[in-house]
């Protein structure tokens, strides 16, 4: 390689040297020695020439090429004027490309993420079969497990896909051929669990409960006693309405009866503190793009090891989503059976680090602070919430749409979007609502800004 200011001196122009970011003392010594030995011929040697000389003397140089760099050497006022006119706009353009617009997602997920989580996706290309990547996945599984229990008692199994895929993994893998499943349905996501069971033609029944009122635990207990159920499936946080189901109580009721519990914690995990042993949860599903505050594309199933090992040898209802097969293969190889989303897992790793720093308890307190701001403005404006305050999750709030003819959700949504707020509609039977979620990297001052927007919109 050659370094020269004269294009005719080089066979091919690779890049232009505009500065040195790092120079070792050894390289500097080599440059100085070369300059000293040629001082008589070149008393005003330029540093590029000395650098070339150092290279010829055996010093290894490493060049980092920076694409789209806008620069101008400024030696006088004319250079400054030219730089201001021609170069500064290019610099500003390059900077605008790098900036990430701050969007406050008040939809139930994917959630708002930190810039550090976004940038974690910009990583070196790597084959996911490399041991280095396998070790990172092992770290992710272990750290996720530590949020909900002890590693010796619980295991986390990763899949590429959405939270619904994790639900399907659990329902299709955890109930044996001779098992009988009871599914609690009090919203769209409980209904989804039932749909999955029906697709696989499983032996199951559905316990119907109000979509916006607390589950009657006495009635549920009678239902559990009536049938010969081996497993129960339920949703911890019903995202349709923001209703928080009493899973710890339900879990204890099931374990007292020898029933295995399968819980959708897609929009509860990493917000509501969960201890699987304390809360009597055997299997539970979640995803990377909700309260863990990562990017969409990875889901995971938390497993009681004893119950997981009981699945060994069970006939497979499907291939890709088989829980035990995925667990066993990863345990032996530190690889998933099929290609994992490399960049999304890097982002999840960063999200886990940030969750550990904040702690789940502090995160739930932050979410609750944002929810309190929302509840106050809803009351102030005379709007109504679908679910009673004491039965809400503090994470998602379903608000009844006003009957005022001036109200239009589309207009409300579009005006909010102009101010970088994204909101979400919600329909529950014949009840029209809009939903406000306060999960993700949302701060109380941003919820205050949204509250002010609501005041301006509903009082216009």
Residue locations for each model-derived region?
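Conserved beta-loop-alpha segment that forms the PLP phosphate-binding cup at the N-terminus of a helix
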Residues: 153-182, 186, 190-194
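Conserved PLP-binding catalytic core of the aspartate aminotransferase-like
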Residues: 384-415
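PLP-dependent enzyme catalytic core of the Aspartate aminotransferase-like
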Residues: 432-460
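Active-site C-terminal subdomain of aminotransferase-like
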Residues: 112-113, 289-377
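Conserved core of the sugar-phosphate nucleotidyltransferase
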Residues: 1-40
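Conserved active-site segment immediately N-terminal to the catalytic lysine
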Residues: 277-289, 299
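Active-site phosphate-binding strand-loop segment of PLP-dependent enzymes
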Residues: 215-270, 283
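A glycine-/small-polar-enriched, mobile loop at the entrance of the PLP active site in fold-type I
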Residues: 102-159
């Amino acid at each position: 390689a050659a370094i020269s200011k004269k294009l005719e001196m080089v066979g091919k122009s690779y890049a232009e040297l505009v500065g040195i970011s790092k120079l070792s003392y050894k390289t500097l010594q080599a440059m100085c020695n070369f300059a000293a030995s040629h001082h008589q011929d070149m008393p005003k040697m330029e540093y590029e020439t000395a650098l070339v000389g150092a290279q010829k003397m055996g010093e290894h140089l490493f060049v980092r090429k920076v694409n789209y760099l806008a620069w101008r050497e400024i030696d006088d006022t004319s250079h400054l004027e030219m730089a201001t006119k021609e170069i500064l706009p290019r610099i500003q353009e390059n900077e605008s490309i790098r900036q990430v617009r701050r969007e406050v997602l008040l939809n139930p997920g994917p959630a708002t993420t930190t810039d550090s989580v976004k940038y974690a996706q910009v990583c070196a290309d790597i084959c996911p079969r490399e041991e280095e990547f396998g070790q990172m996945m092992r770290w992710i599984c272990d750290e996720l497990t530590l949020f909900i229990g002890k590693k010796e008692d619980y295991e986390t199994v990763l899949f590429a896909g959405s939270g619904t895929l994790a639900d399907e993994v659990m329902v299709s893998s955890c109930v044996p051929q001779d098992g009988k499943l009871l599914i609690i349905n009090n919203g769209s996501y409980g209904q989804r669990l039932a749909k999955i069971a029906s697709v696989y033609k499983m032996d199951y029944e559905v316990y119907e409960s109000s979509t916006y009122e607390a589950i009657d635990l006495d009635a549920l207990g009678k239902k559990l006693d009536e049938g010969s159920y081996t497993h129960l499936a339920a949703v911890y946080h019903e995202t349709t309405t923001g209703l928080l189901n009493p899973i710890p109580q339900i879990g204890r009721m099931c374990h007292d009866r020898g029933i295995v519990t399968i819980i959708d914690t897609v929009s509860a995990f990493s917000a509501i503190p969960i201890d699987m042993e304390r809360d009597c949860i055997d299997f539970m599903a979640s995803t990377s793009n909700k309260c863990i505050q990562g990017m969409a594309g990875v889901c995971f199933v938390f497993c009681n090891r004893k119950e997981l090992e009981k699945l060994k040898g069970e006939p497979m209802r499907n291939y890709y989503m088989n829980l035990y097969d995925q667990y066993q293969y990863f345990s032996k190889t530190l690889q998933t059976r099929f290609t994992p989303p490399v960049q999304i897992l890097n982002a999840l790793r960063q999200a886990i680090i940030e969750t550990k720093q904040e702690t789940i308890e502090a995160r739930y307190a932050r979410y609750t602070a944002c929810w309190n701001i929302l509840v106050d403005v809803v009351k102030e404006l005379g709007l109504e919430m679908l679910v009673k305050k004491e039965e809400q999750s503090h994470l998602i709030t379903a608000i009844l749409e006003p009957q005022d003819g001036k109200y239009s959700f589309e207009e409300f949504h579009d005006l909010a979007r102009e101010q970088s707020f994204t909101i979400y509609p919600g329909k529950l039977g014949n009840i029209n609502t809009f939903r406000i979620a306060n999960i993700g990297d949302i701060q109380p001052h941003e919820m205050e800004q949204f509250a002010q927007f609501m005041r301006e919109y509903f009082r216009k």
